[in-house]
């Protein structure tokens, strides 16, 4: 009664070892293990004692951080981690208008054209390799500023008086969002970085480069 699905397992030996540990470990030990990790995962959000213990070990002992971030910074980071694209819509509305995106897209298009000319003029590259390089360049996807399609958070319930519950519901929503993609075509319009992130990345698997709006603002650009 279980449907079989082919998946890619990057490290099969992990599951072989895990199966052995799973079978050899008694149920009470697994229960205690899961209880600990559940509390540990949310310790930074619970009472003051647990917040301090969590910080003392993970931040001070392991990373040498001496002081906790102020409450406002924790609040912003928490909201950003859960509702990143909602905040991103606000950010680009105030800081990155459509004309700024169009200007950057034109700049990147010109860079891609330049790459095409450079490939054609490479003396050491064979005609076959040039053809393959041009085909890859033709399929290259630049993503500028912000997504053309924003994430839909309408099924995620957020309560102002339930911080831990918000995180749990976000985990459930995120899991449902991921599993809904199984067996579906890859959504190449999806972003894996928010517009307000000061960073950029190249994804070789998808042959795409991503420049969030924040990295295209002074003093970075």
Could you describe each region identified by the protein language model?
Residues 1-106, 110:
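Noncatalytic, helix-rich "gating/capping" subdomain that lines the substrate-entry/channel surface
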Residues 104-119, 133-144:
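Short amphipathic alpha-helical coiled-coil/interface segments
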Residues 121, 144-152:
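Amphipathic alpha-helical coiled-coil segments
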Residues 161-221:
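Active-site-adjacent "gating/activation" loops or surface patches in catalytic cores
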